[in-house]
């Protein structure tokens, strides 16, 4: 950028400005920097959970409702009530979640940051957030934007007569976009290059169109085809962890409120917030049609309300949709929408801004899809026959939508947390016994090391248990010992036969220990699996000449199969794990192995340095997958914690030759003799090829670095083992 003499900002469109732009094919290690950097203003001395508990929660809700019912001239409320606008804001804040990789969702308050703040589907939600600013300003850091954006939708529903299922706070704010999220391959908004010839949606995406939360309301590819739309709805909502019943409840319940806005075509709209002139102060979509607000508002390009009481909870949406026939036409905004064929619904809805006028209701293609698709239709007909069941289904689905990315219930804050445990929260039981102490820990370590389980097997078992964790939605991890349950125990990445033996041995130790106790001290299998990894690492370090103690904190418990949603956990199956040098035959994404490694490291909340030291340590411990067949184990001293991996990788006495045209596997040869010394994968060689990883490898491969390597490995290992220990925060 160059500042012109007139004070304007000139954009450079073609000249590369960053290393990534100069070399776009290089591995994007930078996404791991966000796990090391705190770009917020609190300097690490702020505990949001503690601040939230000091909040006058009921006063906050009252203030939100007052804002909601006090129309402002600069952005007049439809029907005198901002409730429907706030519901849309909350829905779109949470609705970016996708279950494939757990990314997106309401955490972080990312709707106020690029790119989400400028997505076309979020048009005019900048006004909703500005309306809430006085509330945020009043309560300061006691309420995050992330919590406020979704709480506002709950309060909106309650103010319009709906009883919600509850609400939990605890979402902290981000102050920069999450660069790890793949929003799609397109380079233009409202395009759909994410489908293949079989109409299958790319992984890990949930939305079907760039810049939209779910699907195109006009229909797929702006085609008003309800049957095709139903297919897209099912795919998109399914990727966001919703089944058919939850999906139908969300659409029917959400569309009970408010209206859509398309007073004219979008040619009257100026730039979105990120591209708007500086004097607009972060507001976008300046509208030059009429007054640019109120009845002249342009948002989606579709115009009209769904029901005759847009600010009341009732059965109007289902009654109108099911009782009347609807025909497609283009509305005043130039978009496809549906109008009633019958004259009975002519003018039955008060105008949103002029009480002397009336308008007709409308439906979206996505609404008509619920009526045309036989499975959805059966559900919505049942909802209409059973209003209480509909209300309960919507309340539960709405709660799930808002909280799906928050992880287990123990992270929930506030007085409205529901008592009921829900299976999608991945519940684990409370400990009903006393925990093991130092004496018992030492006894159990000794018992573990006396078995036939090798250092490698113990490390791999602990890693397989803990590394399912995803920091994106706080799911997975060692707590619960779900590695012994379906589906985890049969995942190829976990080497099922060997895992079964390890679990059998560890379960035997657990039983013998617990049966022998005459007090209330017991050990869970979840703790014992992690402790086995600790014991193995301590032995491996000792065998390399280092005396270390791996920190261990008991307190994990064992979940049951009944507490485990098998289908939901399938998404946590590792299709690639560079730490174990593993990649499935059918990985869900067309990435290179090193890209999978960085993605996995990011989900584990690891920094570049932690990623580097963990890979080197896992190789030294011979903790690679059996599929790897020794690839990456650059040491003559396997199962000892040494830095040979880095020493041999960086040795210029070696050269690296691909063994196949696809350059997935390599042989490391002695330059002078041609002798093959080691075998490597792309994941291994990236630590010598990528400049950032090489710089870190050189630290750990130095002559004086072995002690630092061991200490850093233990620290990074302990971090992974405790990622899901929210009780320790």
Swiss-Prot record:
Name the reaction it catalyses: H2O2 + AH2 = A + 2 H2O; 2 H2O2 = O2 + 2 H2O
At which residues is the cross-link Tryptophyl-tyrosyl-methioninium (Trp-Tyr) (with M-240) found?
91-214
Hydrolase as UniProt keyword: no
Q: Which domain of life is it from?
A: Bacteria
Pfam hit, one: peroxidase
Give residues for the crosslink Tryptophyl-tyrosyl-methioninium (Tyr-Met) (with W-91): 214-240
Single GO biological process annotation from the record: hydrogen peroxide catabolic process
Tell me its EC number(s), please.
1.11.1.21
Describe the protein's quaternary organization and the partners it interacts with: Homodimer or homotetramer.
Q: Which HAMAP family match?
A: Catal_peroxid
Sorted alphabetically, which NCBIfam families does this protein's record hold? cat_per_HPI (TIGR00198), PRK15061.1 (NF011635)
Can you name this protein? Catalase-peroxidase
The protein's organism comes out as Salinibacter ruber (strain DSM 13855 / M31)
């Amino acid at each position: 950028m160059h500042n012109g003499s007139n004070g304007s900002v000139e954009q450079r469109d073609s000249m590369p400005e960053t290393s990534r732009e100069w070399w776009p094919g290089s591995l994007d290690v930078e996404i791991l920097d966000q796990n090391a950097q705190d770009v917020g203003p609190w300097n690490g001395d702020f505990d949001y959970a503690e601040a939230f508990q000091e909040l006058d929660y009921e006063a906050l809700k009252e203030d939100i409702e007052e804002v909601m019912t006090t129309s402002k001239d600069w952005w007049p409320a439809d029907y005198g009530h901002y409730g429907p606008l706030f519901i849309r804001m909350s829905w779109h804040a949470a609705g970016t979640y996708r279950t494939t990789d757990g990314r997106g969702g309401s955490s972080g308050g990312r709707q106020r940051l690029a790119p989400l703040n400028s997505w076309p589907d979020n048009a005019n939600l900048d006004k909703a957030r500005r309306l809430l600013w006085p509330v945020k300003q009043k309560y300061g850091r006691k309420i995050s934007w992330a919590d406020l954006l979704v709480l506002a939708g709950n309060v909106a529903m309650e103010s319009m007569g709906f009883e919600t299922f509850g609400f939990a706070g605890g979402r902290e704010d981000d102050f920069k976009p999450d660069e790890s999220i793949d929003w799609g391959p397109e380079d233009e908004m409202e395009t759909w290059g994410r489908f293949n010839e079989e109409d299958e949606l790319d992984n890990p995406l949930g939305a079907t169109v760039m810049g939209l939360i779910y699907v195109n309301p006009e229909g797929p590819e702006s085609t008003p085809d309800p049957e095709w739309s139903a297919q897209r709805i099912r795919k998109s909502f399914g990727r966001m962890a919703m089944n058919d019943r939850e999906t139908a409840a969300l659409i029917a319940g959400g569309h009970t409120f408010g209206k859509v806005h398309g007073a004219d075509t979008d040619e009257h709209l100026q730039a979105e917030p990120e591209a708007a002139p500086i004097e607009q102060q972060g507001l976008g979509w300046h509208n030059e049609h009429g007054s640019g607000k109120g009845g002249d508002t342009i948002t989606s390009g579709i115009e009209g309300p769904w029901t005759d009481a847009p600010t009341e909870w009732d059965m109007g949406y289902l009654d109108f949709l099911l009782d009347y026939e609807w025909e497609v036409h283009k509305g005043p905004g130039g978009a496809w929408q549906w109008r009633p064929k019958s004259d009975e619904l002519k003018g039955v809805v008060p105008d949103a801004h002029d009480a002397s006028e009336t308008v007709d209701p409308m439906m979206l293609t996505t609404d008509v899809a619920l009526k045309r698709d036989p499975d959805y239709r059966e559900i919505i007909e049942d909802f209409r026959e059973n209003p209480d069941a509909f209300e309960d289904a919507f309340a539960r689905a709405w709660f799930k939508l808002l909280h799906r990315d928050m992880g287990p219930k123990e992270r929930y804050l506030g007085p409205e947390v529901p008592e009921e445990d829900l299976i999608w929260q991945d519940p684990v039981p409370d400990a009903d016994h006393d925990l093991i102490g130092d004496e018992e820990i030492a006894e159990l370590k000794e018992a573990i090391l006396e078995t036939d389980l090798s250092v490698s097997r113990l490390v791999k078992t602990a890693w397989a248990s803990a590394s399912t964790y995803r920091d994106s939605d706080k799911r997975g991890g060692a707590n619960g010992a779900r590695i012994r349950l379906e589906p985890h125990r049969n995942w190829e990445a976990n080497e099922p036969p060997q895992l079964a033996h390890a679990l059998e041995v560890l379960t035997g130790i657990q039983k013998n220990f617990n049966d022998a106790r005459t007090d209330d001290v017991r050990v869970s299998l979840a703790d014992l699996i992690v402790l086995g990894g600790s014991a193995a690492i301590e032995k491996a370090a000792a065998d390399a000449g280092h005396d270390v103690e791996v920190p261990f904190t008991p307190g994990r418990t064992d979940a049951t199969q009944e507490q485990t949603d098998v289908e939901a956990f399938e998404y946590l199956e590792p299709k690639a794990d560079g730490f174990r040098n593993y990649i499935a035959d059918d990985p869900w994404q067309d990435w290179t192995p090193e890209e999978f490694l960085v993605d996995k490291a990011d989900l584990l909340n690891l920094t570049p340095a932690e990623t580097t030291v963990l890979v080197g340590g896992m190789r030294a411990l011979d903790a690679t997958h059996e599929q790897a067949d020794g690839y990456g184990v650059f040491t003559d001293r396997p199962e000892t914690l040494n830095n040979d991996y880095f020493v041999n990788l960086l040795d210029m006495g070696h050269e690296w030759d691909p063994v196949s045209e696809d350059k997935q596997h390599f042989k490391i040869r002695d330059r002078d003799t041609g002798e093959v010394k080691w075998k490597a994968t792309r994941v291994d060689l990236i630590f010598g090829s990528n400049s950032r990883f090489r710089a870190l490898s050189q630290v750990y491969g130095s002559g004086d670095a072995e002690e630092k390597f061991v200490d850093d490995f233990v620290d990074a290992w302990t971090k992974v083992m405790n990622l899901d220990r929210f009780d320790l925060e």
